[in-house]
Structures are given as structure tokens and as C-alpha cells.
From Swiss-Prot:
Its EC number is 2.3.1.129. This is Acyl-[acyl-carrier-protein]--UDP-N-acetylglucosamine O-acyltransferase. One of its GO terms (cellular component) is cytoplasm. It is found in: Cytoplasm. Homotrimer. It comes from Cronobacter sakazakii (strain ATCC BAA-894) (Enterobacter sakazakii). GO terms for molecular function: acyl-[acyl-carrier-protein]-UDP-N-acetylglucosamine O-acyltransferase activity. InterPro entries: Acetyltransf_C (IPR029098), Acetyltransf_C_sf (IPR037157), Hexapep (IPR001451), Hexapep_transf_CS (IPR018357), Lipid_A_LpxA (IPR010137), Trimer_LpxA-like_sf (IPR011004). It catalyses: a (3R)-hydroxyacyl-[ACP] + UDP-N-acetyl-alpha-D-glucosamine = a UDP-3-O-[(3R)-3-hydroxyacyl]-N-acetyl-alpha-D-glucosamine + holo-[ACP]. GO terms for biological process: lipid A biosynthetic process. Involved in the biosynthesis of lipid A, a phosphorylated glycolipid that anchors the lipopolysaccharide to the outer membrane of the cell. CDD domains: LbH_UDP-GlcNAc_AT. Pathway: Glycolipid biosynthesis; lipid IV(A) biosynthesis; lipid IV(A) from (3R)-3-hydroxytetradecanoyl-[acyl-carrier-protein] and UDP-N-acetyl-alpha-D-glucosamine: step 1/6.
Length: 262
């Protein structure tokens, strides 16, 4: 179903069964598959391919040669009807690739809202990208990676399968991330190691001086005290009890499956 207010360029191919919302714009030479839903006001600039069971929300801008919802690169994939879901107000730049999930990995690749995916960024099968994240040019997420809200992944950076990038993290360019990065941390290098707290990013997002001080103290306990994770957990829990901004930092320890960067 194509809304009567949507624009479809004469050279675009929109297959029967696709749903195109009000005021959406499908530009020249785009291809939209039969199981695709595109929300109100979303713009496909030109030469964009959207395939598979893919749902895209409203007011997104998707630039030329982006490929969304195509078959993933997992050799176990056998054609199952897995999905891609994309939220609202994302900017997906040239040649970005977002692959559908796998049956073994939950069947869903998900991108939230208000993200910027720069040129050539790759989001592999079963990844989850939160809200207000930035993947810079050529940033690559392997399968099953989670990127939490407000995280920034620098250009040419690769993230290993199943890694978790915490909220408000900044990973510097040309890095290789092979373990989980706790919230608020700056990481850099191959393999990525911690370089402090993302103070400037947190200031821009309105964190108070007291919260920043508490987060720094938690960071120092984890990375500068010389103690094991089990030893510092109770101390960080005490800080989190007084400063709720530290709670996500503490909770991340239980989420981690690949171990924390060191």
C-alpha cells in the first residue's frame, strides 16, 4: 500500500506488498521489497535498496547506495524470515549496510531513533543500536553487538561479535574493540583500552558536577585501584546508592559477557 501523498520516482521499483507512509519520498533508482514498511516522511535519496522483512519509522533520511535488510553474512543463515527494525529521525549516509538478523541470534537487527550512521558504516546481523548514537565513517559492528544510547564509535573502528558498548561511551577512531566497554568510558586502540571518562560528552548532556565526580570515582576504583572486579563491586555499589548516575556503570558488570576492556 502506497499512501497517496507519498512520492515515488518513476525509476524507482516498489514491489507489490510494500507499505509506504504519508509524505515519504522514494527517490531515483531505489528498490523497495514486498515485505518492507516505510514510515511517514522518510526519504530515500536515490539508489537505496531496502529488502527483507524491514520496518523503517518516520522522518528518516537514507542516502544513496545504502543497503538495508539484505541477507546477512552468517554462513548458518538458511533463509529464515528474520527482520530489521529502524526507528525515527535517523540519518543513514551513503553506502551504509544494515543486515537482517539470524534465527539463532533472536531474528532481529534493531536501530533506534535519532542516530547518525556515517558513510560505509556496517551494522551486522542481530545487532542492537540504541538512540542518539553515532557510527562514524567505516565503523563496523560484527554480529550480535549492542551499542547503548549516546555512544560514539569512531571512524575505521571494528567491534567484535557479542561486544557491548555502554551508554555515553566514546571509542576513538581506528580502534579494535574485543571486550565490553562500560558506560561513560573513553576507549582507544587495538585492542581498545580505557582512557578515562567521557567528561565533555557528559557535560553536554547535562550531567551535574556531583554526578561527574561520582562517575570518576567509580572509574578510578575499577581501573586505577589495582583491585579485582569482585573487590571493587561493593565500593562502586555504595557510590551508586548515593548517585543514581553511577548505577548503569555498576549494572553493566552483570551484562558483560566478554569481560571488560582493561
Amino acid at each position: 500500500m502506497i499512501d497517496k501523498t507519498a512520492f515515488i520516482h518513476p525509476t524507482a521499483i516498489v514491489e507489490e506488498g510494500a507499505v509506504i507512509g504519508a509524505n515519504a519520498h522514494i527517490g531515483p533508482f531505489c528498490i523497495v521489497g514486498p515485505d518492507v514498511k516505510i514510515g511517514e516522511g522518510t526519504v530515500l535519496k536515490s539508489h537505496v535498496v531496502v529488502n527483507g522483512h524491514t520496518t523503517i519509522g518516520r522522518d528518516n533520511e537514507i542516502y544513496q547506495f545504502a543497503s538495508i535488510g539484505e541477507v546477512n553474512q552468517d554462513l548458518k543463515y538458511a533463509g529464515e524470515p528474520t527482520r530489521v527494525e529502524i526507528g525515527d529521525r535517523n540519518r543513514i549516509r551513503e553506502s551504509v549496510t544494515i543486515h537482517r538478523g539470524t534465527a539463532q541470534g533472536g531474528g532481529l537487527t534493531k536501530v533506534g531513533s535519532d542516530n547518525l550512521l556515517m558513510i560505509n558504516a556496517h551494522v551486522a546481523h542481530d545487532c542492537t543500536v540504541g538512540n542518539r548514537c553515532i557510527l562514524a565513517n567505516n565503523a563496523t559492528l560484527a554480529g550480535h553487538v549492542s551499542v547503548d544510547d549516546f555512544a560514539i564509535i569512531g571512524g575505521m573502528t571494528a567491534v567484535h561479535q557479542f561486544c557491548i558498548i555502554g551508554a555515553h561511551v566514546m571509542v576513538g577512531g581506528c580502534s579494535g574493540v574485543a571486550q565490553d566497554v562500560p558506560p561513560y568510558v573513553i576507549a582507544q586502540g587495538n585492542h581498545a583500552t580505557p582512557f578515562g571518562v567521557n567528561i565533555e560528552g557528559l557535560k553536554r548532556r547535562g550531567f551535574s558536577k556531583e554526578a561527574l565526580h561520582a562517575i570518576r570515582n567509580a572509574y578510578k576504583l575499577l581501573y586505577r585501584s589495582g583491585k579485582t572486579l569482585d573487590e571493587v563491586k561493593p565500593e562502586i555499589a555504595e557510590i551508586a546508592a548515593k548517585h543514581p548516575e553511577v548505577q548503569p556503570f555498576y549494572d553493566f558488570f552483570a551484562r558483560s559477557t566478554r569481560g571488560l576492556i582493561r
